[in-house]
Every structure is written in structure tokens, then in C-alpha cells.
From Swiss-Prot:
UniProt cross-references to InterPro entries, sorted A to Z: Ribosomal_bS6, Ribosomal_bS6_CS, Ribosomal_bS6_sf, Ribosomal_S6_plastid/chlpt, Transl_elong_EF1B/ribsomal_bS6
Superkingdom field: Bacteria
GO cellular component, one term: cytoplasm
General function of this protein: Binds together with bS18 to 16S ribosomal RNA.
Protein name stated in the entry: Small ribosomal subunit protein bS6
Biased composition (Low complexity): 107-120
Organism (species): Synechococcus sp. (strain CC9902)
Region Disordered: start-end pairs: 99-126
GO molecular function annotations of the record: small ribosomal subunit rRNA binding; structural constituent of ribosome
Length: 126
């Protein structure tokens, strides 16, 4: 079993932004990771939760967790974009050591294609 390093980024979005905008932020940050040459391993929407203490006058936030691996250059690009964004009220990236998390189907992406044999039509009988 190989112990590869990977990164987990947890970020908190403002609670007052609409659902469509939340999805656009999730897609934007996921695409940034891919454009930086890294791979998105997992993307989990944790939902709206109460904060332990107020951040920027907000008592709640929308939590999103993003697991990715790469050479580490993607972290700088991602955190710079989050720092500039007014919709991200807090973020943290942690480098993890250990087995890579099992890949899941990321919302907004296509599921793996079924077996080719299942899609092949049967020849018609004459």
C-alpha cells in the first residue's frame, strides 16, 4: 500500500448566497484544481452549519470539502482565488499523508460509462 500525499481544502461560503451561486463556486474551484494540473479526488457539500464563533458578522456558513492531489502548486492558485472572493469567509488546506481516499462520483460530472457490451445493440433477426 502506497502512502501518497494529498490535500484537503475546507472552505466556508457566506450563508446568504443562492444555491445556484454555491454550485458555481464549487465548479469554479474544482476546475481551478484541474487547470493547475492536479486531480480532484472528492468534493463534498457539507451544507449550512452554525459557526463556532461569528466570522465577518455571519453566524452560519455553507461548508464544502475538496480533496485533491498534485504537486502542491494548485494550492497556491486555489487559496489566492478564495482570498480574493467575497463569498468565501474562511478556508483551510491541509496536506494529508496516507492512502488516497476512495474516489466518488463528484456532483456535476459524468458517471463512469457502463460496460461497452451492455450498450451494443443486438443484431436483428431476418
Amino acid at each position: 500500500m502506497t502512502l501518497d500525499p494529498y490535500y484537503e481544502t475546507m472552505y466556508i461560503l457566506r450563508p446568504d448566497i443562492p444555491e445556484e451561486e454555491v454550485e458555481s463556486h464549487v465548479t469554479k474551484y474544482r476546475d481551478m484544481i484541474v487547470e493547475a494540473g492536479a486531480e480532484v479526488l472528492d468534493n463534498q457539500m457539507r451544507g449550512k452549519r452554525r459557526l463556532a464563533y461569528p466570522i465577518a458578522k455571519h453566524k452560519e456558513g455553507i461548508y464544502v470539502q475538496l480533496s485533491h492531489n498534485g504537486d502542491g502548486q494548485q494550492v497556491e492558485v486555489l487559496e489566492k482565488a478564495m482570498r480574493i472572493s467575497e463569498d468565501v469567509i474562511r478556508y483551510l488546506t491541509v496536506k494529508q499523508e496516507g492512502p488516497l481516499p476512495a474516489p466518488r462520483v463528484v456532483p456535476g460530472t459524468e458517471a463512469p460509462e457502463p460496460a461497452q457490451a451492455a450498450e451494443t445493440p443486438e443484431p436483428e433477426a431476418s
